Amino acid sequence: MKPNIHPDYGPARIICACGNVIETRSTKKDIRVEICSQCHPFYTGSRQRVVERGGRIERFRQKYGR
């Protein structure tokens, strides 16, 4: 590898909207995600629906009142 052309690779934190924090390594310091393995229904086994920010159709209807 050529010296001094690669980004710094160091400790990073992945922060989920549920409050879970995962320590890892990356070229970015903090990474924010909406869902992780602690709150995703597939991993938790719950059948509840995931809270969404709104799909494209719903946002269109809100914007144009249809």
From Swiss-Prot:
GO terms (BP aspect): translation
Family (UniProt): Belongs to the bacterial ribosomal protein bL31 family. Type A subfamily.
Pfam (any one): Ribosomal_L31
PANTHER family, sorted: 50S RIBOSOMAL PROTEIN L31, CHLOROPLASTIC, LARGE RIBOSOMAL SUBUNIT PROTEIN BL31C
UniProt subunit comment: Part of the 50S ribosomal subunit.
PROSITE patterns in the cross-refs: RIBOSOMAL_L31
Name by which UniProt lists this protein: Large ribosomal subunit protein bL31
Binding-site list for Zn(2+): C16, C18, C36, C39
Keyword terms of this UniProt record: Metal-binding, Ribonucleoprotein, Ribosomal protein, RNA-binding, rRNA-binding, Zinc
UniProt remark on cofactor binding: Binds 1 zinc ion per subunit.
GO MF term (any one): structural constituent of ribosome
Superkingdom: Bacteria
